[in-house]
Structures are given as C-alpha cells and as structure tokens.
C-alpha cells in the first residue's frame, strides 16, 4: 500500500477547464482567456531574450525577479519590497496558505468563487469554511470577527461577475483576525480595484495575474502586493527560480505597454456589454459583470442542455455541476465575431 497522507488520498483535486487538442477548430470561451494576442512588445522581448541560438536558456533566470518587481512597483505605486512575483497567481495563493494556516487551522472563502482555494487548503491539511452570498452581493453569515487564518475574496467574483464595493472590503479587512486575500484576477476589466487597502491594513494581500488581461495565460505569471513583512515570509517558501527567463522578459514588456492593455480591455468591455444586451433580448438572465465573462441562465434554467448544444457546435463554454450554478453557464468574452457566432448558436439551440 502506498503510504499517502490521508488528506491527499481522500481529496478529489481541482478540475480545470477543458483544453481541446484541436483548439483551432473551436470557439473557446470556457477559461476566460483573452481573445487578443499579447502586446507586440512582448513577442519582441521574448525573441530578444532568446537570442539567435537560445544560449541564454542555459543560464538560470533571476531568482528574485527584481526587475519585474521594480516595473510592477512603478505601475502600481509601491516599493519593490511590497511585491513578489510568482509562477501564476496560484503559486501565491498556495504559499499564503502554507505560510499562515497550519494543519487543522481554518481558511475561508465565498462559494461560489474559485474552488481551487479549497483544494489548496486540503493539501495543507487546513479546514475549509465557505460562505454564501446574499441577494445584495454581500457575504452571508460572515461573523463580526472572523478567526480563520486566511480568507480569500475573489473580486470581481468568478464565475458570477460583480465586484465587491471598496468600503465593504475595507470593513471585511477590519473583521478578519487573519489575512484577507483579495484575488483580483480580473481587476483590469473592472471599474475599480482595492489596491489602496494594502496600505491601510497590515492583513490585506492583493493578488494579480498576467493570464487574463495581458494575454499571457500560457506563460504563468502572477504577483502579490502586501506589506514587506508578508512579502518576506512568502519569499522564504516560494520556488527559488519560479519564473523562467522568457516569462520575466515577457512580463516586463507587458507591464510597460499599458496603452495596448487599455485598448484590449476596452474592446472586451465593449463586447461584454453588447453581448449582455443580446442575451437578454432572447430571454437569458445575465448577471452584470466586471470581468471578461458573463454568467448567463437560459429561460428554461437548463444550463447543461444549452452547454451540450454549444459543444455540439464546437463552441466551448463552462458549465458547473454545482447546484448553485447548474442552471446557467459562464461564457468568456471573445472577439466580436466569436460572440456573434455564439449568439447565433444560442438562437439555434433555443
């Protein structure tokens, strides 16, 4: 018998969105990827780093990602000591649990949101407590003083779409005895963010990713912004060469090209609003979204039926079997052409 830890043997593990092998033949709207390529400056930086013969790849990358921390600090208005780079924001989420929640201690998060928080907690042997949402998009039953070691809040919420108001998040930070982690994966698509709370509260951490708005999901680049003492703790336990040379070069170029980022986000927001209106015109219930996706429910509330119909037409969206979500689908925002084709497919399915 293989001597697995009991918590590992009994856990289910996280199931990511499906990546079809023949991806070019699909309209892929299931994992909130950006429909536009990364900045041309990113491609240029990667080629320059690679060089004519790839010799640079034989040398380890910067272990500290110091240049990235400096560029991110300039962009967000923080000293580099407040920033840590990561192999996708998932690495930071994992290390936050490792740093702050011992076996048997509690972490919490909103359900529905990113269920991977629970998976990471299970690996650590931490206890998981989930909280629902009220009709006015507040956390149901959240205590006046939450004693869990880490509480994760995805804002904008995924898969639903709305953001939590800044003043409400500020209140949550005061009510959390442990760390409040604001997962701002989709912040660049939203009207506001909560970065200012990092300065206001010593227990607030904001995580960001370059996977969505910067079109770099294939390179796995993330970061966290927090007080220097929190960053120093995370730095102790991260993988020491966690970002490869090409990813570091790409990240610097992407963060510096804010004009390109702004234009991509503008186009996605514009398409999101158009698609919201079109879905409602055919009877769908659509939650107003601040992300690059919509959660939409068909008139008969049978999300699986519509998902299957789209799948048969090679349009891939995300359906969740969770009873709280099974009535609808999360649909990533693609190009205008992709969304027009998706709308036509939905009208065919009925």
From Swiss-Prot:
Signal peptide: none
Pfam families documented for this protein: Aminotran_1_2 (PF00155)
PROSITE patterns assigned to the protein according to its UniProt record, in alphabetical order: AA_TRANSFER_CLASS_2
Molecular-function GO term, any one: histidinol-phosphate transaminase activity
N6-(pyridoxal phosphate)lysine: modified positions: 212
Enzyme Commission (EC) number: 2.6.1.9
Gene source species: Geobacter metallireducens (strain ATCC 53774 / DSM 7210 / GS-15)
Name by which UniProt lists this protein: Histidinol-phosphate aminotransferase
Subunit structure, as described in the record: Homodimer.
Alphabetical keyword list: Amino-acid biosynthesis, Aminotransferase, Histidine biosynthesis, Pyridoxal phosphate, Transferase
Cofactor entry: pyridoxal 5'-phosphate
Entry's family note: Belongs to the class-II pyridoxal-phosphate-dependent aminotransferase family. Histidinol-phosphate aminotransferase subfamily.
Record bears the keyword Transferase: yes
GO BP terms in the entry: L-histidine biosynthetic process
UniProt-listed InterPro entries: Aminotrans_II_pyridoxalP_BS, Aminotransferase_I/II_large, HisP_aminotrans, PyrdxlP-dep_Trfase, PyrdxlP-dep_Trfase_major, PyrdxlP-dep_Trfase_small
Membrane-spanning intervals of the chain: none
Keyword Amino-acid biosynthesis carried by entry: yes
Catalytic activities: L-histidinol phosphate + 2-oxoglutarate = 3-(imidazol-4-yl)-2-oxopropyl phosphate + L-glutamate
Cysteines joined through disulfide linkages: none
The protein's annotated pathway: Amino-acid biosynthesis; L-histidine biosynthesis; L-histidine from 5-phospho-alpha-D-ribose 1-diphosphate: step 7/9
């Amino acid at each position: 018998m293989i001597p697995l830890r009991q918590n590992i043997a009994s856990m289910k593990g996280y199931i990511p969105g499906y990546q079809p092998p023949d991806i070019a033949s699909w309209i892929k709207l299931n994992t909130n990827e950006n429909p536009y390529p990364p900045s041309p400056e990113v491609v240029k930086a990667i080629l320059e780093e690679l060089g004519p013969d790839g010799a640079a790849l034989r040398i380890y990358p910067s272990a500290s990602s110091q240049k990235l921390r400096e560029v991110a600090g300039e962009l967000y208005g923080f000293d580099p000591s407040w920033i840590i780079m990561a192999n996708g924001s998932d690495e930071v989420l994992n290390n936050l649990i490792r740093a702050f929640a011992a076996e048997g201690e509690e972490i919490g998060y909103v359900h529905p949101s990113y269920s991977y928080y629970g998976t990471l907690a299970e690996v650590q042997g931490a206890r998981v407590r989930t909280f629902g949402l009220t009709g006015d998009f507040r956390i149901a039953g959240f205590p006046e003083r939450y004693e869990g070691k880490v509480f994760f809040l995805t804002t904008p919420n995924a898969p639903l779409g709305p953001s939590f108001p800044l003043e409400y998040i500020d209140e949550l930070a005061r009510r959390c005895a442990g760390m409040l982690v604001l997962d701002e994966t989709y912040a660049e698509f939203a009207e506001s963010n909560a970065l200012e709370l990092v300065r206001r509260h010593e227990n607030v951490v904001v995580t960001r990713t370059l996977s969505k708005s910067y079109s770099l999901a294939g390179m796995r680049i993330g970061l966290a912004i927090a007080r220097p003492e929190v960053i120093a703790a995370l730095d102790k336990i991260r993988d020491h060469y966690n970002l490869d040379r090409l990813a570091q070069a790409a990240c610097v170029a992407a963060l510096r090209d804010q004009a390109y980022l702004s234009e991509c986000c503008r186009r996605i927001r514009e398409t999101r609003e158009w698609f919201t209106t079109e879905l409602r015109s055919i009877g769908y219930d659509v939650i107003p979204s601040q992300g690059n996706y919509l959660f939409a429910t068909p008139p008969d509330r049978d999300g699986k039926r519509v998902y299957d119909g789209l799948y048969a037409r090679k349009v891939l969206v995300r359906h969740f079997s969770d009873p709280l979500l099974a009535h609808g689908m999360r649909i990533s925002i693609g190009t205008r052409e992709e969304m027009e084709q998706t709308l036509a497919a939905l009208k065919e399915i009925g």
